[in-house]
């Protein structure tokens, strides 16, 4: 996968290129990350990239010209077919389905805004899509870009040590993940669920699915509205709800 980044703080992305899953993907040649700083494309000696917005008001805007030239330079370093993404509070909210869609492009240029945003003329002429990582305010698009890069990298074949991890993660199947445990078997008086120690793979699979369904029902019930549950999933969810309600009643 090829990713071009347009950012006035390119050094922030060393964390992506040097560490964790994304860092390993870069070392394996599965992920290429290149940065272009709009300041290098400014037409004045102060390398100015921002200015006051027309109409007044607080804050500054990133100017169109340095960003536009940086985008065009990034496009010159890859083949055709690259999609330009602006990380923006006004964009479509990112979810796992959106990650799948974006990762399918293979080549992306990510625009990291700053200040109050960017000149609208750049959005209308150069941006293919706007994406948001949530309904909250950040100081810039760099962190949003890192989140997007990390989530997409997990879908690249060979990026994870265990390919099944990407399938079993929360949201990969539209559900939250089930609880997980590691050694020791008993810690501070808390025991690992016996089914996980049984070695019975079918029972373990059913337990994990039931816990995943139940956790989603408890914490993010709206996610279930978007899913078509199988007969097995409906049965397991009802079992979880029955057991949960009995537990609550016993504690009253």
Swiss-Prot record:
Catalytic activity, EC: 2.1.1.228
Localization per Swiss-Prot or TrEMBL: Cytoplasm
CDD domains linked: TrmD-like
Molecular function GO terms recorded: tRNA (guanine(37)-N1)-methyltransferase activity
Gene Ontology biological process terms, A to Z: tRNA N1-guanine methylation
Keywords: Cytoplasm, Methyltransferase, S-adenosyl-L-methionine, Transferase, tRNA processing
GO cellular component annotations of the record: cytosol
Top enzyme class: transferase
Binding site for S-adenosyl-L-methionine: 113, 133-138
Subunit structure: Homodimer.
Reported function: Specifically methylates guanosine-37 in various tRNAs.
Protein family: Belongs to the RNA methyltransferase TrmD family.
UniProt-recorded name of the protein: tRNA (guanine-N(1)-)-methyltransferase
The species this protein was found in: Baumannia cicadellinicola subsp. Homalodisca coagulata
Protein encoded by which gene: trmD
